[in-house]
């Protein structure tokens, strides 16, 4: 038994040495990486509308384009509440398809939350549900904030992501 282990030991050492010396692929980078870019909303559809306690409650479908670290198309369904004082709160889920930073290409689900007014909102989105992701070669996790105009549909985003 000792002879078998000793015969394999040099090969194991050589493989470990190569793993340390050779750089890994870009998608295997450890730690958070910066994310930034722009969003353009190209379509907004009101799926349903109701009222409760002076609030207007909307279910909306939003589609658009992302450019930058995350590059491609997105579609999301949001629950938006317009409060009597004019402020807006929003929560929803969506799917981003295209380039997902250095993690690869494919589709990844995300959740979104935002608040603001009828003219401008700020919020955050986060890629979730890795089992539903089709990104290759690796999956993605992120925490990204955004701000922009609901009038023009133009937003900017910044944050971090890492490949899992």
Enumerate the predicted regions with their spans.
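Bacterial N-terminal signal peptides that target proteins for export
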Residues: 2-13
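Compositionally biased, intrinsically disordered/low-complexity regions enriched for serine, proline
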Residues: 7, 20-22, 29
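Generic low-complexity segments that are intrinsically disordered, proline-rich and/or Lys/Arg-biased
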Residues: 11, 24-26, 33-35
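Bacterial N-terminal signal peptides
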Residues: 13-23
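Beta-strand-enriched cores of mature, soluble protein domains
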Residues: 29-164
């Amino acid at each position: 038994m000792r002879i078998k282990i000793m015969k394999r030991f040099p090969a194991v050492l050589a493989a470990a040495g190569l793993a340390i010396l050779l750089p890994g692929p870009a998608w295997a980078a450890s730690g958070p990486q910066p994310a930034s870019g722009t969003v353009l909303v190209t379509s907004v559809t009101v799926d349903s509308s109701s009222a409760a306690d002076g609030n207007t409650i909307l279910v909306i479908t939003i589609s658009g384009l992302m450019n930058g670290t995350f590059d491609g198309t997105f579609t999301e369904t949001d629950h938006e509440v317009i409060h009597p004082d004019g402020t807006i709160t929003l929560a929803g889920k969506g799917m981003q398809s295209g380039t997902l930073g250095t993690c690869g290409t494919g589709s990844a689900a995300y959740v979104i939350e935002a608040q603001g007014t009828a003219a401008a909102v700020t919020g955050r989105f986060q890629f979730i549900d890795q089992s539903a992701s089709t990104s290759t070669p690796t999956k993605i996790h992120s925490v990204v904030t955004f701000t922009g105009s609901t009038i023009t549909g133009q937003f900017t985003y910044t944050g971090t992501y890492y490949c899992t």
